[in-house]
UniProtKB/Swiss-Prot annotation:
Protein name as it appears in the record: Large ribosomal subunit protein bL28
PANTHER family assigned to the protein according to its UniProt record, in alphabetical order: 39S RIBOSOMAL PROTEIN L28, MITOCHONDRIAL (PTHR13528), LARGE RIBOSOMAL SUBUNIT PROTEIN BL28M (PTHR13528:SF2)
Taxonomic lineage of the native organism: Bacteria, Pseudomonadati, Pseudomonadota, Betaproteobacteria, Burkholderiales
Native species: Polaromonas naphthalenivorans (strain CJ2)
Biological-process GO terms, alphabetical: translation
GO molecular function terms attached to this record: structural constituent of ribosome
Matches recorded under InterPro entries: Ribosomal_bL28, Ribosomal_bL28/bL31-like_sf, Ribosomal_bL28_bact-type, Ribosomal_bL28_sf
Keyword line: Ribonucleoprotein, Ribosomal protein
Annotated family: Belongs to the bacterial ribosomal protein bL28 family.
Highest taxon listed in the record's lineage: Bacteria
Pfam families given in the database record: Ribosomal_L28
A GO CC annotation given for this chain: cytosolic large ribosomal subunit
Length: 77
């Protein structure tokens, strides 16, 4: 499974490790992903999502129902 947030769509980014001597080596910045079970009151059931911390804050802000409408429109859930 890809390391992508189901809510925000954020995935890994590519960048550099930079040493004190300014040597650069490639690295990946991984999103802060967690599996979360979120209670959906309108459907009276749990929904399991793989989301980032930013996705959790988005659910707190907009509500799980609005986020689920967007996910279903994209075919994620």
């Amino acid at each position: 499974m890809a390391r992508v947030c189901q809510v925000t769509g954020k995935g890994p980014m590519v960048g550099n490790n930079v040493s004190h001597a300014n040597n650069k080596t490639k690295r990946r910045f991984m999103p802060n992903l967690q599996y979360r079970r979120i209670w959906v009151e309108s459907e009276n059931r749990w929904v399991r999502l793989r989301i980032t911390a930013a996705g959790l804050r988005l659910i707190d802000k907009n509500g799980i129902d609005a986020v689920l409408v967007d996910l279903r429109a994209r075919g994620e859930v």
